[in-house]
Amino acid sequence: MPHPELTLERRIDAELCGLDAKMCVYADDLHGHVVERGADDEFESESTIKIYILGCLYAQAEAGKASLDAELTYEARHFVDGSGLIRSLGEGARLRARDVATLMIVVSDNIATNMLIDYLGLDTINAFIRSIGCTHTKLHRSLRSDNWSEKLGTITPRDMGRFFALLAKGELVSPQASDAMRNVFRHQHYNTMLAGSIPPYYTDPEESHVDPDLIYVASKSGSMDACRNDGGLIHTPYGDYVLVMMCTDFANKLEVNDHPSVIYGNRVSRMLFDQYLALEGSFVK
C-alpha cells in the first residue's frame, strides 16, 4: 500500500496546489480503481456536450430512427460563430449525417452541432444522456451567436468519464458503434490539456513511424471564458484508461497553449500516464 500522503489522489492535490483556479479530476483504469477530485461538481459543458450528440446519433441509427447516411442541409438558421469548417461551404451545402458528426467532434464544428440538434431533437438527445446514466448532464439549447453568455450544457467529470468508460468497453450503443465513435474521437484536433504531456513519439506516429495503435488518445475538449474541459480515453498496450479534467475560476480568459489549465492538466495527465504504464494497466498495485 502507498504511504497515505503519496496516494494518487494526494499526489494530484500536491501537483495542483499552486493552481490559482479550480480543477476537478475523474480517472478510471477500468479495472476497479477510480481517482476522484470533485468528480460530481457541475461545470459548464461547452463543446464537451457534443460527445452525447454523437452518441445519440449512433443510438438513433441503431434503433432505425435516424440514418448515418441521411443528407443534412446547412441552412441559415444553423449559422453560428466559432469553430468549424461547414460555414466555408456556404448555405445549401449537403453532407451525410455521419460526416456532419465527424466535423462536430474533430474540429468542434458549431454549425455541424446545430444541424445535428435540429436533426435529432433536443429532447431526444437529453433522453439518450439519461439512458446511459449521465444523470447530471444536460444539453440546454442549440448554439447562437447572440447568447454565448447562456450555458450550452451542464456536465460533471464523472458523467463524462462514464461516457468514455462505456465507449472503451464497447458498451456505448453497441460494439460496432463504439468502435466507430472511438475512431472519430481519435482524430479530434484539440486535445492539448489531455495529451500535451504524452511523448510526441507516441502521439505523432507519422513522424516517429511507431505503430499508431500502440498509444493514442480519443477525446473531446471544450473551452470558453468560464471553463477549460478535456476528457477521453488513453489507449495503451495494457488497455484503455479514462481521464477527465475540468477547470474553472481562472483569471486568464485567453485561448493560449500556456494557459494554467493546460500546464497543470498536463502534469496530472502525465502522472496518470506514467503510473498506468509502470503498473502495466492499473493505477494501483
Residue map of PLM features:
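Active-site SXXK
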Residues: E44-L72, L243
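Beta-lactamase-like hydrolase cores
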Residues: M1-E44
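Mid-domain, small-residue-enriched loop/turn segments at the edges of structured enzyme/sensor domains
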Residues: L19-M23, M115-L172
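Short, glycine/proline-biased beta-turn/loop segments that scaffold the active-site neighborhood
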Residues: A63-L89
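Structured C-terminal helix/loop/strand segments within mature extracytoplasmic catalytic/sensor domains
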Residues: P2-A14, V34, G170-T192, G196, ...
